[in-house]
């Protein structure tokens, strides 16, 4: 009896360790609180056991120091970090930057020794005060002149985290969000250098295609499509992962991005297949209210009465209804992506974003909260 109990305990421990071997890094966006009705998401809606890391987006920089962005950020910081009372193993990070912050503001700070130093010194006390375990740098689309400065910023930030931890506290984590487009990578990131100083890199393997193009196409294909033009041969997760690994990123520090949103188009003709001409972005979702983007829970509504298709080569679905075309991810495609990243021995998966998944479980017909993120977790936890 005692031996059987011991064996059972050992098996449970092994399963826990196999699950913990992969990171599931999940972003939460503070502006999701402003969506109407069932689209409004606050940090207390998050299952504290769903992800290994939750990243709060975004912090601001004021007078070269890290700062809050929203009027109630401090309250939301506290709500998020209270989740660790229920799951002490959960790690939380604060992401600084983002799309609206812009690359030029980062450039000005990182290119000058004094402003860079001021910013770096401001980070540890801010993170400690608000209960975060680390910082995520979301310097998106740095320019050619920024490549060296970004590397210096990462190197000096890590050195500051090491120095600060000498007081006996657990060392703060440092991660970065990195664009997955080949042109953006070549222009702005010294992958081999920054990898040395980061705990993990979140590769943004989505937004490969959008309304800025003249034709329909999936924004987050796993593999290259057989009919892809030569210009699109780089626009898939498999190429991006392989390229970043080739540039020197260790597989055990690379986290592959998986979106819980889709990109939509308004068709310009009766053609509905991939490569069909478009007149612009798709109509805004009822909750997210942004042209060309739909949350997964909005896509579940859209699928009622829509015609669905699946790219067998790219391993992702799309749907059409009237003059609307939506490329998205479903449970099957995110599972395939999770299996893929395991086969490449990557560090894990990143989800953008928890508040775009069906976080209430009200929309996608399964009475399951976070269906996409949960599907990823199931694959990562499997032996």
Curated annotation (Swiss-Prot):
One of its GO terms (molecular function) is carbohydrate binding. Residues 1-21 form the signal peptide. Glycans are attached at residue 60. The keyword Secreted applies. Residues 22-383 form the GH18 domain. Its main location: secreted. Keywords: Antimicrobial, Apoptosis, Cytoplasm, Disulfide bond, Endoplasmic reticulum, Glycoprotein, Inflammatory response, Lectin, Secreted, Signal. One of its GO terms (cellular component) is cytoplasm. Detected in smooth muscle cells in atherosclerotic plaques. Detected in regions of vascular occlusion in the aorta. One of its GO terms (biological process) is chitin catabolic process. Transmembrane segments: none annotated. Disulfide bonds join 26-51, 300-364. Induction: Up-regulated in cultured aortic smooth muscle cells upon transition to a nodular, multilayered culture. Residues 324-338 are annotated as: Important for AKT1 activation and IL8 production. Gene3D superfamilies: 3.10.50.10, Glycosidases. Chitin binds at residues 70-71, 97-100, 141, 204-207, 263, 352. SMART domains: Glyco_18 (SM00636). InterPro entries: Chitinase_II/V-like_cat, Chitinase_insertion_sf, Glyco_hydro18_cat, Glycoside_hydrolase_SF, Glycosyl_Hydrlase_18. It is found in: Secreted, Extracellular space; Cytoplasm; Cytoplasm, Perinuclear region; Endoplasmic reticulum. Carbohydrate-binding lectin with a preference for chitin. Has no chitinase activity. May play a role in tissue remodeling and in the capacity of cells to respond to and cope with changes in their environment. Plays a role in T-helper cell type 2 (Th2) inflammatory response and IL-13-induced inflammation, regulating allergen sensitization, inflammatory cell apoptosis, dendritic cell accumulation and M2 macrophage differentiation. Facilitates invasion of pathogenic enteric bacteria into colonic mucosa and lymphoid organs. Belongs to the glycosyl hydrolase 18 family. Monomer. This is Chitinase-3-like protein 1. The lineage of its organism: Eukaryota, Metazoa, Chordata, Craniata, Vertebrata.
């Amino acid at each position: 009896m005692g031996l059987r109990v011991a064996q059972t305990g050992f098996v449970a421990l092994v399963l826990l360790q196999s699950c913990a071997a992969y990171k599931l890094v999940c972003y939460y966006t503070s502006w999701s609180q402003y969506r109407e009705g069932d689209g409004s998401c606050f940090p207390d809606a998050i299952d504290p056991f769903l992800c290994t890391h939750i990243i709060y987006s975004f912090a601001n920089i004021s007078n070269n120091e890290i700062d809050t962005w929203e009027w109630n950020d401090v309250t939301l910081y506290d709500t998020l970090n209270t989740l660790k009372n229920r799951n002490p193993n959960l790690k939380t990070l604060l992401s600084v930057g983002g799309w609206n912050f812009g690359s030029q503001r980062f450039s000005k700070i990182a290119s000058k020794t004094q402003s860079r130093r001021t910013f770096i010194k401001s980070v540890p006390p801010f993170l400690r005060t608000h209960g975060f375990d680390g910082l995520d740098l979301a310097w998106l689309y740095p320019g050619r002149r920024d490549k060296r400065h970004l590397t210096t910023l990462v190197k000096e930030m890590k050195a500051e985290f090491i120095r600060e931890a000498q007081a006996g506290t657990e060392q703060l984590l440092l991660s970065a969000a990195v664009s997955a487009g080949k042109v953006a990578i070549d222009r702005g990131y010294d992958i081999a250098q920054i990898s040395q100083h980061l705990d993990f890199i979140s590769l943004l393997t989505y937004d490969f295609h959008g309304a800025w193009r003249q034709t329909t196409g999936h924004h987050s294909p796993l593999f290259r499509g057989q009919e892809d033009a030569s210009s699109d041969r780089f626009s898939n997760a498999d190429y991006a992962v392989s390229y970043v690994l080739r540039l020197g990123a260790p597989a055990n520090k690379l986290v592959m991005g998986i979106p819980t949103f889709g990109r939509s188009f308004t068709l310009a003709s009766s053609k509905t297949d991939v490569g069909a001409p478009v007149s612009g972005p798709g109509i805004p979702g009822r909750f997210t209210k942004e042209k060309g983007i739909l949350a997964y829970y909005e896509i579940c509504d859209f699928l009622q009465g829509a015609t669905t298709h699946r790219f067998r080569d790219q391993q992702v679905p799309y749907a059409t209804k009237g003059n609307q075309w939506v490329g998205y991810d479903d449970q099957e495609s995110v599972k395939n992506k999770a299996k893929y990243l395991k086969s490449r021995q990557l560090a894990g998966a990143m989800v953008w974003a928890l508040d775009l998944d069906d976080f209430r479980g009200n929309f996608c017909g399964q009475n399951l909260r976070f269906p996409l993120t949960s599907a990823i977790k199931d694959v990562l936890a499997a032996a």
